[in-house]
Amino acid sequence: MKIHEFQTKELFRTYGIPTPEGRMVNTAEAAGEAAGELGGFPVVVKAQIHAGGRGKGGGVKLAKSADEAKSLAGAMLGSRLVTPQTGPEGTLVQKVLVEQGVSIAKELYLSVVADRETAGIVIMASEAGGMDIEAVAETTPEKILKVFVNPLAGLSAFHCRQAAYGLNLPAEAIKPFTQVVSGLFKLFVDYDASLVEINPLILTTDKAVMALDAKINFDDSALFRHKDILALRDTDEEDPLEVEASRFNLNYINMDGNVGNMVNGAGLAMATMDIIKLAGAEPANFLDVGGGANAEMVENGFRIILSDPKVKCILVNIFGGILRCDVLASGIVQAARNTAIHVPLVVRMEGTNVDEGKRILAESGLDLHSAASLKDAAARVAQVVAAA
């Protein structure tokens, strides 16, 4: 789960991480008033959406007066901001952050992230702040410093010093930088985050260290422990189908292709999408119904897949274990009765009660393609899509 920049900065301040003073507003008039209250110009007007790359898309603007802040906010609010992360359709801007401008001496990058390779936590830092860190990692990886932290031992002062020295910070900035790293790390651990990022972290002309931007990703599986964070969720920033799927405990991610797929298990789902692509088609979604799915969940899964107008065919790929094949088959029949399945359906299943599952489907009278293997299923899907 993600939250907005202004919400993240509120969390930052509770952990002793300095940020510019700012106000979140949702009208142009309020933006002008907020600009006048901040105590000096220029101010920065920043569109509040969950996607990155806002500056390049025109979502971050400098205002030298309250009237200019009002005008800029008016142009942003109600518009669709297009960034490299939103896709061509963009994201509707419903809030802006009006923030005090600061004098920047140096821009840095700083983040704390879960590292799967070491099963630990890594502090990532770079002097290439304010830039697309993925691009920096690809073109000039030597510019990124990594400090690995054992999660059982926790953060120590030497980790912070290692990062500070690696960034060539002036002596007077090392102590405030250490405080920022400590706060960021504690926030990461306390809230079960997968990423906490400041880009850029700035050194001001008066030697202060400050978070100019803020981003945090929370582990969805741990949100039951953080009701305060869950209350910050903005479903307007999320894909409507993904929000709907979450109501039924379905793991769904919308994609750009035209082959819907329903699978049990994340690994099998990713392999299924790979096979679809190898067969020359494109997956329209990732949908893991999980091992404990029942007929109702299967029906809801079909309803969500069919809500996507791009879908021209559906591939069901199930390895029956906890989710038995007969339960899946009953769910398919139930979905066909209650939800008009108006696209071709390809079903491949193996495992527990597979013969009973195949019998249920065979006697249902449904128009579907039964595949003997995953390769056969993908080939059938590709044929159906090509003929559509």
Swiss-Prot record:
Cofactor descriptive note: Binds 1 Mg(2+) ion per subunit.
Residues annotated to bind Mg(2+): 199, 213
Quaternary structure and partners: Heterotetramer of two alpha and two beta subunits.
Family: Belongs to the succinate/malate CoA ligase beta subunit family.
Domain of life (superkingdom): Bacteria
PROSITE patterns given in the database record: ATP_GRASP (PS50975), SUCCINYL_COA_LIG_3 (PS01217)
GO BP, sorted A to Z: succinyl-CoA metabolic process; tricarboxylic acid cycle
Domain called ATP-grasp: residue spans: 9-244
Reactions accelerated catalytically: succinate + ATP + CoA = succinyl-CoA + ADP + phosphate; GTP + succinate + CoA = succinyl-CoA + GDP + phosphate
Record keywords: ATP-binding, Ligase, Magnesium, Metal-binding, Nucleotide-binding, Tricarboxylic acid cycle
Pathway annotation: Carbohydrate metabolism; tricarboxylic acid cycle; succinate from succinyl-CoA (ligase route): step 1/1
Organism (species): Desulfosudis oleivorans (strain DSM 6200 / JCM 39069 / Hxd3) (Desulfococcus oleovorans)
One GO CC term on file: succinate-CoA ligase complex
Alphabetized GO MF terms: ATP binding; magnesium ion binding; succinate-CoA ligase (ADP-forming) activity; succinate-CoA ligase (GDP-forming) activity
Residues binding substrate: 264, 321-323
EC number: 6.2.1.5
InterPro entries reported in the protein's UniProt record: ATP-grasp, ATP-grasp_succ-CoA_synth-type, ATP_grasp_subdomain_1, Succ-CoA_synthase_bsu_CS, SUCC_ACL_C, Succ_CoA_ligase-like_bsu, Succinyl-CoA_synth-like
Lyase found in the keyword field: no
Binding site for ATP: 46, 53-55, 99, 102, 107
Xref: Pfam families: ATP-grasp_2, Ligase_CoA
PANTHER family: SUCCINATE--COA LIGASE [GDP-FORMING] SUBUNIT BETA, MITOCHONDRIAL, SUCCINYL-COA SYNTHETASE BETA CHAIN
Function in brief: Succinyl-CoA synthetase functions in the citric acid cycle (TCA), coupling the hydrolysis of succinyl-CoA to the synthesis of either ATP or GTP and thus represents the only step of substrate-level phosphorylation in the TCA. The beta subunit provides nucleotide specificity of the enzyme and binds the substrate succinate, while the binding sites for coenzyme A and phosphate are found in the alpha subunit.
Protein name: Succinate--CoA ligase [ADP-forming] subunit beta
Cofactor: Mg(2+)
Ranges annotated as spanning the membrane: none
